[in-house]
Amino acid sequence: MKKLLVTGSTFPRWANDTEPRFILDYAKAMTKYYDVTVLVPGAVGAKEEEELEGVHVIRYHYFPIHKFETLCYPGAIVPRIKQKKIRILLVPFLLLSLHHQLKKHSKEFDVVHAHWLIPQGIMQMSVKNTPYIVTGHGGDVTSLNKGILKSMKLKCLERAKAITVVSDALQDYVKQLYPNQKTSIIPM
């Protein structure tokens, strides 16, 4: 059976968690076709590695003092930074750790599905020889569209084997910003 690595930054930390579970639900559905592993940031109180509802989950640490790994949970990265501005200092650590984990794990998989253009998509594009799919969920598509980040997002889309978005509006946005890109809509 082919192997699929799913990456994201929003994922249940444990059974019955209130964090959105759409990536877990997607990963569970894909187990019919692939041997699936999910790679997500660590969270205080969450297991580093486990089987969650039949899906293998790896949670990577991104800061030396684990109790300060508060960038992604609860909630999402941007709202967490807005809550406490100092959390922006965790972003480089998250990016470096994600890149390290992708280099470490991607070669074990036939394909990677990166949820969010930033940070998962742009980090995945730097890992050579592993085909990837990228999904845009919202702000990762509609914001940060100037300068180097726009260039990185464009390269991410160009190198992706497939591009998906979760709505018609996001598909239109991708087509405006990045002409000649084929996108599919897969609501989550």
Go through each PLM region and give its residues.
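N-terminal subdomain of nucleotide-sugar transferases
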Residues: 1-61, 107, 158-162
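Alpha/beta-hydrolase
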Residues: 7-8, 114, 136
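Flexible loop residues that form catalytic
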Residues: 9, 117, 168
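Nucleotide-sugar donor phosphate/pyrophosphate-binding loop at the beta->alpha transition
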Residues: 16-23, 128-133, 138-159
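Donor nucleotide-sugar binding/catalytic pocket of nucleotide-sugar-dependent glycosyltransferases
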Residues: 37-40, 56-59, 133-137, 150, ...
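An aromatic- and histidine-rich active-site surface loop
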Residues: 44, 88-101, 111-129
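Short loop/helix-cap segments at secondary-structure boundaries that form the rim of catalytic
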Residues: 46-53, 126-127, 174-178
